[in-house]
């Protein structure tokens, strides 16, 4: 190849690279503009259903940069339990109503492949004892043959950092192949409810009966779930409509399903058809990385969010139209 040919080839390569980079930047800009337009349009349509009030309770501690699940203790007043998303060890964190870290508990015998949600309810063998149910159910790549829910007797944060033993494990498979899930709730009858988060499939919920939970907690036997049922939440990533957590109210008759941009409310238990309790509560850009949700006894909702480049996430409380006090 001549020197001129080498120069021409190099020039073409550099020029081609520049064109490629410009094209990528342009495509990203177009996509970003479309998403911004979709969010703006959604805000105009849904703004009337924003929370009637919202207050910051505190900023999440550095140890909880990816806070995911959230429950409010009924045994220890003013205590909130949470955990990190994938990337952390099997740890539970107790925080107070200002998001101040109270204690950290290592869970012996548990793995933390992708913890995504948690629920609070009676222990399988003792309804008088409070247990934390932690869902290791994240599966963005749809590659996990089975997932699991860990059961831990609720510890006392006043003892400080410590280790807790695993009380039981509920391993399970879905009837139709892998799912990615980010929601877990426990009913007044101690059934477990798992809610999916998927970009191209309608949101579903699967139930694990209390009797199966007790059996699995004793022997760790694999549970094969029955067919799930759909919730009327069509995923739309451009406006943040992807499920990140769920919660049942204290009466057990309202299921809140939060996404990045909205909170949906459904009558529970679901009978022949799924019915909404109220219009979805529009969060908009309040929590672009919103994750956890839990009902207070007064019907207001406590929310958590992950850290962003701007700083730590928040612990917030909101009141949504048509729900709670």
Where do the protein language model's features map onto the residues?
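Sequence/structural signature of beta-propeller domains
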Residues: 4-325
